[in-house]
Amino acid sequence: MPFNHNSKAKRPKFLLDLQIKELVNIPQSSGYCYTKWRLKDGTGTSGHKVALDGEHQTTSTQSRGTTKHVHVQHHRAQWNYSLDKPILVKLHLDKNGRFLKKILVLDVFFEFADANSSLTSSSSPNGKVKKTTYANATALTATGNNSYSQKITGKLLLGTVDIDITEYVKEDETPTTNRFLLKHSKVNSIINVSLQLKLVRGSYEDFNISKSFTNGQLANYRPGINTILDNTSELSSPTSTTNQMSPKNTFSNFNGIGTTVAKPGTNATGNSTSIKSPTSTNHKSSEMTTKPGLSTTISSSMSPLIESLYQKTFKLPWDPRPGEFTPRECVEDILQGGNGWAKNEKGINLIDLQALRLNEMEEEYYNPNYGNNLGNKASSWPPNPSDDGYSTMGKREYLEKKQNWSHMSRAQRAKLRTHNDEDNENTANDKGSDKDNNSVEDNNPTDFLTDRIRENKNWSIITPSG
């Protein structure tokens, strides 16, 4: 393909139309989501009007923006955000006529909402967000598109997406919609974005158009059963039917609430809509009228079912350690910057404290003098069965105790255990064989240690032996 070396041909201009539609697979079922977008290195333009198809069109040179803050419903945030005016963007070419990358960055944020508090919306004509800082939380109130009714207790960056807009240059200039998995994220949320580029300066013969995408778009992805129902309800019926809907039919959704469907053939404005059937019994195209909002009604009635199925994934039977998080609590902790493990009031992981306790008991059994060493309180910790010491142990005390039982190497531990086993065996032989074997077995220190370990590992599944 010939490449024009004209200076302007190396810098074609396009009108960028951006749409940010929705975010799906959000772990939380409540809260707020919004997206910030920006073009790296700006737009490279300064004009506000271009001549397109013989008409002057007003454009924008903004290189960043923000969607509205929307409430998360059924683990989905729907913005349907679009630009008021297309953005005039200047792209650059290399010596081979290929586009240099122009990156569009999307930053997706999630805001945690306190369900126990509510705020009064202030009257603002432009719908701007008002921020009020409290001692431990930030309360946001807004009107217009941003509808806050709860106190915002924290903000979290869910993830980012980098899109090379030069890959969306198409000669037919049709919009392209893709789904992107969030990067630098701990969740599998997917954002739906649509891009369209229209050439306003230069010619398509001046550059090479990319034939593929390299930004990790998800192809042929369906976010859930709601979208499947919406799409299938719009498809044509494969065969004609004689079953006609009554003037007013009522069916129950999954909440037990009756939903009324208006008479087919008329919508809310009185205009009829129809779906053509490709085949019929008399080989003629027939028409079946339906209400255009029916698919939306079915989709809405399915939402509680989807919610229920989603919740059940967090309630699978399992055997957690005492005091540990449930799967839902684990996800919440990770999203708030934690590691997914429950902690005591001093910030020490309970699983680490449990491991310390088991190792101390093991060391105490194999080394009788371990608890009598200076500065070592292993035999007296925890002080009583009702106080496990988890809520009071700080980081310093934990590190000191951990160092006390880890001062010996693994080989030294094994040698000490072998020596103690031989001493115990010789002592048992000296006692004589006149004692009852059952009594000796009941007072065996090994059984006592096993019982103590099982008491602390009550989360383990014990399979009964045959």
Curated annotation (Swiss-Prot):
Q: Quick one: where's region Disordered?
A: 262-298, 374-393, 400-452
Q: What's one Pfam family here?
A: NT-C2
Please note every region of biased composition (Polar residues): 266-298
Q: Which residues carry this modification: Phosphoserine?
A: 433, 439
What positions does the domain C2 NT-type occupy?
4-199
Q: Where are the transmembrane segments?
A: none
> PROSITE patterns from the xrefs?
C2_NT
Tell me the protein's name: Uncharacterized protein YBL086C
